[in-house]
Design a protein with these regions (language model features):
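Conserved GNAT-fold acetyl-CoA-binding loop/helix
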Residues: 10-39
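Conserved acetyl-CoA pyrophosphate-binding loop and the N-cap/start of the following alpha-helix
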Residues: 53, 83, 87-95
Length: 160
C-alpha cells in the first residue's frame, strides 16, 4: 500500500513521532520526506524493490533496494519508532542485501547518509559498511524545510 509506506517513512524521519525514535532527521529537517507519487514511481520501477516488515498485520518497517550499476543501493530505511530497538532494522537491511545479490547479482551495497547523523553511520559500520570518502551536497532545493544548512551526504558501502 503506497499510502502506508509513505506514512511510515514520514513517521520514522520527521515530526513529533520521529523524535521518539533513536535516530531521526527531525532536528535537521521539517516538511515531508517523501510522498505517495514518489513511492508509487519507485514501486513501478523494475530496478527497485521495497522490502516490508509487518507486526500483527501492521506495517512497521520498510526499505528500498535499487539496482545501481553493478551495485545495489539502499534507501528509505524506516522503522516505526515504537518498533525500534527490536532487531527489525538489522533484518530489513539483511533482506535488502540478499535481494540485491539474488535479483541483480550485486557485488556491493551502497547508500548515502547525512554526515551529521553519527549514530546512524556507526550503526551501519557495525554491520560492515564503511565510509568511502565520497561526499555530495545535500539537495536543499528539494527540502525547503531545512532547519540548518551545514550538512551534506556521505557514502557508505559494503561488499556483498
Amino acid at each position: 500500500d503506497v499510502r502506508a509506506v509513505a506514512m511510515l517513512i514520514e513517521k520514522a524521519y520527521r515530526g513529533p513521532a520521529a523524535a521518539t525514535g533513536w535516530t531521526n532527521e527531525a532536528h535537521l529537517l521539517t516538511g515531508p520526506r517523501t510522498g505517495e507519487d514518489e513511492i508509487a514511481g519507485l514501486i513501478a520501477d523494475p530496478e527497485s524493490r521495497f522490502v516490508l516488515a509487518e507486526q500483527n498485520g501492521v506495517l512497521v518497517g520498510c526499505a528500498l533496494v535499487q539496482k545501481d550499476g553493478e551495485d545495489g543501493y539502499f534507501g528509505m530505511f524506516s522503522v516505526d519508532p515504537a518498533a525500534q530497538a527490536q532487531g527489525l532494522g538489522k533484518k530489513l537491511l539483511a533482506a535488502c542485501e540478499k535481494a540485491a545479490r539474488a535479483e541483480w547479482n550485486s557485488r556491493a551495497m551502497g547508500m548515502v547518509v547525512i554526515n551529521l547523523r553519527s549514530e546512524l553511520i556507526a550503526w551501519y559500520e557495525r554491520r560492515g559498511y564503511t565510509l568511502t570518502g565520497n561526499r555530495e551536497p545535500f539537495p536543499f532545493d528539494e527540502a525547503p524545510g531545512a532547519l540548518r544548512r551545514d550538512f551534506d551526504l556521505v557514502e557508505l558501502k559494503k561488499p556483498l
